[in-house]
Structures are given as structure tokens and as C-alpha cells.
UniProtKB/Swiss-Prot annotation:
It comes from Rattus norvegicus. InterPro entries: Complex1_LYR_dom, Complex1_LYR_LYRM1, LYRM1. The lineage of its organism: Eukaryota, Metazoa, Chordata, Craniata, Vertebrata. May promote cell proliferation and inhibition of apoptosis of preadipocytes. This is LYR motif-containing protein 1. Belongs to the complex I LYR family.
Amino acid sequence: MTAASRQEVLGLYRSFFRLARKWQAASGQMEDTIKEKQYILNEARTLFQKNKNLTDPDLIKQCIDECTARIEIGLHYQIPYPRPIHLPPMGLTPRRGRGLQTQEKLRKFSKPLYLKSHDEVS
């Protein structure tokens, strides 16, 4: 990791803590605000710990872009959680063969940038 990317990553990590400190839930209720602040902190810690040993500059850049997108989307929509996405359904393809491979490729490419670190299957 270069010194410039290290500083950028540390700045993003600090911005998550600043964001959590200033966060207000859209509902205005204190319980919701506390839960959402805790979610922001836990999510940041988990993802930064998961990616701390990356050495490939391209992967580091992707993670930085994902982090920036998550911050911007959270601020714009006033929700700390990733926005739900609609992936192509797999109900019409056979269990094996080209159709399944095509559907899996579509699902892989249709996953937005801000969800690349999530291992969840929709």
C-alpha cells in the first residue's frame, strides 16, 4: 500500500466515525438513532478489518471507491444500510448448462459497486 492510499484509507475510516457521531435517524427516535450509529461503526470495523491485508493496488482502489460510494449513498438517502437491489431471477434456467452459467454471470455483473464486500446471496 502506498503512502497516499494509506492516508486516503485512514481518512475514510475517520470519516465513518465522524458520520456515526453526527448521525440522526430519519424517524427521529433516539432508539433508532442509537441502532443506526452502532450499525455504521460495526460495518466500518468489519469491512476495514476484512480488507486490511490487501496489497493489490487495484483491489485497494476498488475498496476505496466502494467505501466512498457507501458514505455518499448513506448521506443522500439518510439510511445507513445498503440499498436493496434487484438481481435477475434464476427461476427460469435449468440447474446446469449454459443457461445457469449465463444467469450466474449476470448476477455477478449486476451487483453494484457499494455491495462488492458483502458475501450475502440475494
